[in-house]
């Protein structure tokens, strides 16, 4: 897969628990090092519970707080990156399509061009309904990278689909 080097990046991550909580710090570091504009949106309607502390990337001080907000604030503060979070579950296709809609960024220079964001939808969810929603959003999109991750106690998988126009 070849990514365009001249487009801003937008990552929308659904799920901030077992998988998303551990993926987030690496994505923050990666986006921080890019030589182009980048946005990171973390979505999850769940709160940190005591049972999450042994297998998710949270600490006792996070108990009762929204998972998306905790991750967004923790890592954006450390790296000085502005991050968006949605403290709700994404349950409808219109909600998801609005989240993955690319913004235009001014590229500057003599001609003052605009470039659309390259959007990456990252599924870190633990339910089939949201996976189906992501798949439908991918099917209706014209320009999207969709990465879905899932795991059980002893197994896991990652699936990547791409519709990138260079």
Identify the role of each PLM range.
Residues 1-11, 30-33:
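A short, basic/flexible loop-to-alpha-helix module at the beginning of a structural domain
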Residues 10-29, 44:
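Glycine-rich adenosine-cofactor-binding loop
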Residues 32-33, 98-107, 111-115, 132-144:
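Short, surface-exposed basic-aromatic patches at helix termini and helix-loop junctions that form
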Residues 39-81:
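Glycine-rich phosphate-binding loop and adjoining beta1-alpha1-beta2 segment
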Residues 66-117, 125-127:
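A structured beta-alpha segment of the ubiquitous adenosine-cofactor-binding alpha/beta core
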Residues 120-159:
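ADP-ribose/adenylate-binding Rossmann-like module
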Residues 164-166:
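Conserved small/polar residues in nucleotide/adenosyl-binding loops
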């Amino acid at each position: 897969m070849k990514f365009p080097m001249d487009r801003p990046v937008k990552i929308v991550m659904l799920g901030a628990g077992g998988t998303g909580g551990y993926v987030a710090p690496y994505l923050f570091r990666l986006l921080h090092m890019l030589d182009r504009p980048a946005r990171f949106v973390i979505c999850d309607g769940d709160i940190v519970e005591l049972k999450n502390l042994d297998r998710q990337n949270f600490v006792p001080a996070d108990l009762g707080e929204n998972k998306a907000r905790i991750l967004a604030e923790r890592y954006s503060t450390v790296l000085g990156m502005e991050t968006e979070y949605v403290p709700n579950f994404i349950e409808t296709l219109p909600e998801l399509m609005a989240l993955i809609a690319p913004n235009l960024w001014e590229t500057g220079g003599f001609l003052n061009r605009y470039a659309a964001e390259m959007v990456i939808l990252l599924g870190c969810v633990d339910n089939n309904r949201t996976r189906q929603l992501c798949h439908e959003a991918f099917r209706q999109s014209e320009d999207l990278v969709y990465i879905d991750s899932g795991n059980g106690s002893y197994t896991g998988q990652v699936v990547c689909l791409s519709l990138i126009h260079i």
